[in-house]
Curated annotation (Swiss-Prot):
Belongs to the glycosyl hydrolase 10 (cellulase F) family. SUPFAM superfamilies: (Trans)glycosidases (SSF51445). It comes from the Eukaryota. It comes from Arabidopsis thaliana. It catalyses: Endohydrolysis of (1->4)-beta-D-xylosidic linkages in xylans. This is Endo-1,4-beta-xylanase 4. One of its GO terms (biological process) is xylan catabolic process. The GH10 domain binds to xylan. Disulfide bonds: none annotated. Residues 1-24 form the signal peptide. Pathway: Glycan degradation; xylan degradation. Residues 195-494 form the GH10 domain. SMART domains: Glyco_10 (SM00633). Glycans are attached at residues 92, 190, 300, 339, 545.
Length: 570
């Protein structure tokens, strides 16, 4: 591997090595002041920390003939998580992706993240690696194949986390992004009603939902239904709403199975995200669609499909995967033109304007080697869709499927990916989370699910799993007798942990009169509650007739401390 040979490089390398190995200072991976933004700055922020060296030299990299190294010989420790950040800009191109790669001495390269860099201003490149070995690595920056590209890099930082430190940071973020401090203020007619009164708080519906996919087998098994409805309040159907399932023969629609599953969900207050209005992969079209060669004919049947399925379920879904996997594939673009996806989303928004319309892809958060669907490329595709004329008010969404390999997940890369996907400010969902069976499947799945839950951009998770009878062979949550597997125990644990337990709190005694002097005001202690809908009941053991019930929603928008006022007619 070629190295810089100009004189100042060795001094800069020494200073940056001190910075990386000594200070541990970097862009905080759990601070979202900048990580969810995509502004390009005229000057990168400068650290005020004592780093032991300048650490802010501008490294000018000509990506030509392999001259791209920035830092050599950084020692990693197996099991630790390393977050790396840098500010980058281009000097001879207007816009180009710039990526960060970690190179091991055995020749293996691990992609750490990338950013869409621009000429003349600085973009934050944030990524990292979860070490599955101990030993030295080199860090280098590169672009997407343009020889002679000139890249400037400043403020390279790396921070190491032990797993326990990472988990602690996750828990602290969860307190900020998933919970609010709440204080109840109650107005009573008389003091005797105030004294001894108790507030009972019961969560009816959490804002964040951990759901699970279902398939047609749930209609054939009472035990599967009972198992499912006792746990989950969010689902999507694996195949039953897809075009090949509802119109296997041209002109002969059959929604019987999808309708029955929809009825089951609605009867049990289970929310449904619609999965796949259209699929951009030719392989998964109905067989009769594959034979169509006339673009006008394909356009007509496509419009019929969209009108049929979206009107049928309008008002009954909480979102739609509109053009499934349209970063990996381009069947409709090849047949109908390059703007096919944008036009489809435009039509979908007119058919159902009140729900988010998702771009749903695989390998974006779970597999760093599939650069076709890198987070930057997914964001670019969504930007193309919403920037199409007339699409600026579309309610967009990003679906990251999350089919993880049976190895230690790269949580540093996953966090970078979620940061990037979240930069559009659309809701991000993990939509099909599973993992092939392996000895550490439960441990790895817990790492993945907690990583998603602790990220502010992620609004929901749907598992691709179920009991053995359901046929989900990767993430099996219960055996043939519906006894939990270890993976099932994990999911039950998280469902319980991410749901607010019922709680009772007293009304504090330091009451005072209101401004008119006609009522007595009491306050509850502050309490931390998960976001969601609650049933709040005020009772007094000494007053049998006092039992007043209220509905309260705890939301992020209410600020750090949410004041809830209740008027008690006693």
């Amino acid at each position: 591997m070629k190295r810089f040979n100009y004189g100042f490089f060795h001094l800069v390398l020494f200073l940056i090595s001190l910075l990386l190995l000594g200070s541990g200072i970097c862009m905080d991976p759990f601070s979202y002041d900048q990580s969810l933004k995509s502004e390009c700055l005229m000057e990168p922020p400068q650290t005020t920390a004592n780093t032991g060296g300048e650490g802010v030299k501008e490294l000018k990299i000509n990506e030509n003939g392999g001259i791209r190294n920035v830092v050599e010989g950084v020692d990693l420790r197996e099991g630790n998580i390393y977050i790396t950040s840098a500010w980058v800009k281009l000097r001879n191109e207007s816009q180009r992706k710039v990526g960060m790669t970690f190179s091991e001495k055995n020749g293996r390269n691990v992609f750490g993240g990338e950013v869409m860099a621009k000429r003349g201003c600085w973009s934050l490149l944030k990524g990292g690696i979860t070490a599955d070995f101990s030993g030295p690595i080199d860090i280098f920056f590169e672009s997407d194949g343009l020889a002679g590209l000139e890249i400037s890099v400043q403020n390279v930082r790396m921070q190491r986390f032990h797993k326990t430190q990472w988990r602690l940071q996750q828990d602290q973020v969860i307190e900020k992004i998933r919970k609010n401090k709440v204080r109840f203020q109650m107005s009573f007619k008389n003091k005797s009603a105030l004294e001894g009164s108790v507030i009972s708080i019961e969560q009816i519906k959490p804002s964040f939902l951990l759901g699970c996919a279902m398939n047609y087998r749930i209609l054939e098994s009472d035990s599967y239904r009972e198992w499912f409805v006792s746990r989950f309040r969010l689902t999507s159907f694996t195949n039953e709403m897809k075009w090949y399932a509802t119109e296997a023969v041209r002109g002969q629609e059959n929604y019987k199975i999808a309708d029955s599953m929809m009825q089951l969900a609605e009867e049990n207050a289970i929310l449904v995200k619609g999965h796949t209005v259209l699929w951009d992969d030719k392989y998964w079209q109905p067989n009769w669609v594959k034979t169509i060669t006339d673009p006008e004919d394909l356009k007509n049947v496509t419009l019929n499909r969209m009108n049929s399925v979206m009107k049928r379920y309008k008002g009954r879904l909480i979102g739609w995967d509109v053009m499934n996997e349209n970063v990996h594939f381009n069947y409709f673009e090849n047949m109908l033109g390059g703007n096919a996806s944008a036009i489809v989303y435009s039509l979908a928004s007119k058919l159902d304007p009140d729900i988010p319309l998702f771009l749903n892809e695989f390998n974006t958060v779970e597999y760093d080697k599939d650069r076709v669907v890198s987070p930057v490329n997914v964001v670019k595709k969504m930007q193309e869709i919403v920037s199409f004329p007339g699409n600026n008010n579309i309610k967009g969404g990003i679906g990251a499927q999350g089919h993880f390999a049976p190895v230690q997940p790269n949580l540093a890369y996953m966090r970078y990916a979620l940061d990037t996907l979240g930069s559009l400010s659309f809701p991000v969902w993990l939509t099909e989370v599973d993992m092939f069976k392996c000895p550490d499947q439960v441990k790895y799945m817990e790492d993945i699910l907690r990583e998603a839950y602790s990220h502010p951009a992620v609004k929901a998770i749907i598992l691709y799993g179920g009991p053995e009878v359901s046929g989900f062979d990767k993430l099996t949550l219960a055996d043939k007798d519906f006894k939990n597997t270890q993976a099932g125990d994990l999911i039950d644990k998280l469902l319980q942990e991410w749901k607010q337990e019922p709680v009772e709190i007293p009304i504090q005694h330091h009451e005072h009169n209101d401004e008119e002097g006609g009522r007595i005001i009491g306050f509850s202690p502050e309490i931390s509650l998960l976001h969601g809908h609650y049933r709040v009941t005020v009772t007094n053991p000494s007053m049998k007739n006092l039992s007043t019930r209220f509905s309260v929603e705890v939301t992020k928008e209410s600020g750090h401390l949410q004041e809830v006022q209740l008027v008690i007619d006693a």
